[in-house]
Each structure stands twice: as structure tokens, then as C-alpha cells.
Amino acid sequence: PTPLHIPHLLAAAKAGKAVLCEKPIALDMKDVEAAQAELDSVKVPVMFGFNRRFDPSFAAARAAVEAGRIGDIEQLTIIIRDPAAPPAEYIKVSGGIFRDMTIHDFDTARFFLGEIEEVYAAGQNLDPALKDTGDFDAAVVTLKAASGAVATIINNRHCSSGYDQRLEASGREGALFAENIRATTVRLSNGEVTDAQEPYLDFFLERYADAYRDELTAFIDAVNNGSPVTPTVEDGVAALVLAEAAERSARTGQTVEVEK
């Protein structure tokens, strides 16, 4: 459970064990601040589980950006829709959509754009079954980066067509598109449909199987070779800062400046 991430991370580190920790680092920045001195003193490798950095499509798009294939990024769009919401009991203790779901996208935005300065979020309550959770079940977030680039994140906890996972990066000299993955590449055209395709994959373990494998491989290689791990503790903290800013923005309707 998330409340045990920091205690277990520190316990493992004190025992001299390298750590691969699931997101988020905590449910509240106060917990991070209370443990900051201990976190800063950790000497073993600590990697955070933002697995989408290792998704082959997202990673290839990032590599193309780094290679200058589209020039400087001006706009980034991240669309993440789940087939169905988790149980209401889980949502109530998860920290909410921004800490539990969008936090991956906050890290992806930083992965592509660098540091974020402003956050605006609009939360939606679309599913009556989740009304009593006290959380949003869909959200749209706008992030303004220090570079001047803008990211738009679209999240929804229900999508009838499956696990909808897309990314678009637009630059001065071109654009990159990471599309959905399907079970097969077969397309059907006949008298009733044109270009019908397989549904999207319907579970995150299927969609991100390669990402989880490559993430674990990168962690093991870094530990064995003594090379730096990434994403870092600092990346975990930065994503939580953005999640808290988005929550505050969605509740108040105000743009929130990110504390440096």
C-alpha cells in the first residue's frame, strides 16, 4: 500500500538493498518532507516505477525528440483512458485520480518537456456508481513547462473501446504519434464496415507488458553495472507535487503555480 512506500524504501535501503518502488512515493507531500533527510541520505540505488518511460512506443517517441526529429516540442497531448474504474473501496484509499492514475502522465510530461511551472485541472464526475468516493472519475489537465511548451492530459476511468493509451508530440519541425496497441493487426472491410479493427487491449498488464519487462531489466542492469537509475526519487517527488497541484486546481478552479 502507498502509505508504506517510504517506510519500506528506507528499511530496504538501510539493509543495503537496491529498491524499485511503485508510484506514488506517498499520498501526501507532508510524508515526503518528514522523511526528506533520510531519503537524501540513501546510498543504494532507488528507482521509481514509472513504467511508461520504458514502453517501446513512448520511449521511441522520446528518443526521436532527443534526436531533434521534430525540433523543440511546442505541444504534448497524453490520452489515457481505462476500460473500467477500480473498485470504489480502492479509490477511497488510493489518494484519488491525480495521485493514482494521472501521476504516470505527470511523469511522462516531465520526461518529454522538463520541469513544469503551472497546472490547471478540471475534474469530472461522470459515473454515478463512483459518486460516493469523493473523487473524480475523469479529468483534463493542462501543464505549462518552463520551456513554454504546453501539455494536455486527458484521463477517464471508463472507456468502452478498451485501454486507450495514446501520445502526440508536436514540434516546430514535425510531430510524433504513439498509437494504441491491439491484439492483432488485422483490419476488416466489407459491406457493413470499413477498416474495422480489433479492440484495444483491455488490461494494463497486457498493454504495458513490454514496459514492465524493460523497466525491470533497466533496474537490474543499473544495479549490476553501478550506473545511475532512472526514474529517481526526485522524479517520484516531482510527480507527487504535480498531483497535489492538480487536485488543488480541480477543487478550486484556479491555476496553480508549482512550488520550486
Regions found by a protein language model. Name each.
Residues 14, 40-41, 224, 251:
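Residues at the C-terminal ends
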Residues 218-260:
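C-terminal helix-rich "cap/oligomerization" subdomain common to oxidoreductases
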Residues 45, 52-132, 253:
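Predominantly a Rossmann-like dinucleotide-binding segment in NAD(P)-dependent oxidoreductases
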Residues 15-17, 42-44, 149-150:
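A short helix->loop->beta-strand "cap" motif at the edges of active sites that frequently abuts
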Residues 203-217:
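Active-site loop of classical SDR/Rossmann-like NAD(P)-dependent oxidoreductases
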Residues 21, 46-48, 153, 178:
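Hydrophobic residues in well-ordered beta-strands that form the structural core
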Residues 107-185, 213-225:
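Contiguous beta-strand/loop segments that form the cofactor/metal-binding neighborhood of enzyme cores
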Residues 1-38:
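Beta-loop-alpha module in the N-terminal Rossmann-like domain of NAD(P)-dependent dehydrogenases
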